[in-house]
Amino acid sequence: MFLGMFSKTMEDKSNSSRNRTNNTPLPQQIRTDMGSLYSADLTAYNSACREDPDLQSFDSSLHQRTNRVINSLASGAQTRSLSFDALIEVSGCLLEMNQEVVRFIIESKEDVWDNKDLTCLVNAYFDSSIKTLDFCNAVDNCVKRARIGQMLLQFALKQFEMESSGSNKSVEPGTNKYAKTLEELNKFKASGDPFDGDFFMLLESVYEQQVMLLEILHKQKRKLDKKLKNIKYWKKISNVVFVTAFVSVLIFSVVAAAVAAPPVVTALAAALAVPIGSIGKWCNHLWKKYETAVKGQKDIVLSMRIGAYVTMKDMDNIRVHVDKLKIEMESMMQKVDFALKEKEEEVAVRLSMHEISKKFDVFTERIEEVGDNATKCSKNITLARTIVLRHILSFPSSSDSGQGNLIEAITL
């Protein structure tokens, strides 16, 4: 592109050189206002160079290139002609600058405003949270079944009190004194274990999914942390791109001046003596927008990571309390089995019922603990989903469709 523009400029100058006088006005390609036009930005660039050793190195290299070009052009300025060596110097300088920009851009890797990885990650998080909510619902159903068993045991204890006190007048002679109690115990036994094998398979599946999600979120967080540390490098890219375009314009102006108006070469050379390049307002906006985008991604990932971690801990608590409840459930079932097996022995039934009575409050407490933890887990998941959604809604996007894709991921 640079060589094409250069060739066209030289062709135009060659066609008009025969009729040109010393008073010929400068062609449009010659820019003498670059220094004043970007004076504020050049000052900002000076500050950036002082803070960034790599930018200092780039600036020094750029000065060397432009000085070589100026010297080559100045040597033939009085004859209003360009030597072959000067042409090579100009084209070589422009090519080197282009290559430098390409190198920086290649190393920049990706555009953060259209991040497909983040969209996939959000999808995975909300899919996982939905499955975890399903698990919480499964826990609630199990707790409801356990509470039914609790009610049966409670009713059995009431029957036992009545039958033990002799207040139950409906007992026929020759029948088991604790017939009603044993009937309720049979109902409790028939209700079975509310936390069967399918429940624990679901728990393990959801838990493993949470562990995998947490690992992915951890890797993504480290990746974004690295990007935030490299923000200065991204700012450097915008500096390099802008200053390259700036110098390219000035070089073409010098080339045009060398043919059209030799005295202007000196003035342009003086302009180039100013520390060249500028980040400019648009470049400054560019890298700040990038930094904001990366921080926005990090906020989303952090909120998902916290949500996944809290969910894992909630599930750990549910697992612990379910295990405790199963222990109490098995203990109750053993006592019920003993009473039913020894139903003809009133003493054995009384002993079993006394043991059931002593453990009944603990059994009830374990059921409530599981239910409370399932409710807490469900609330935490809902809260985490809301927080992630808020971050997504405030997430900077290069297009409305990008944000729409993220929102669609959690509303389907």
Swiss-Prot record:
Disulfide bonds: none annotated. The keyword Mitochondrion does not apply. It is found in: Membrane. The chain crosses the membrane at residues 240-260, 263-283. Residues 1-30 are annotated as: Disordered. The keyword Membrane applies. It comes from the Eukaryota. Residues 314-348 form a coiled coil. InterPro entries: DUF677. GO terms for cellular component: membrane. It is a multi-pass membrane protein. Keywords: Coiled coil, Membrane, Transmembrane, Transmembrane helix. Belongs to the UPF0496 family. This is UPF0496 protein At5g66675. It comes from Arabidopsis thaliana (Mouse-ear cress).
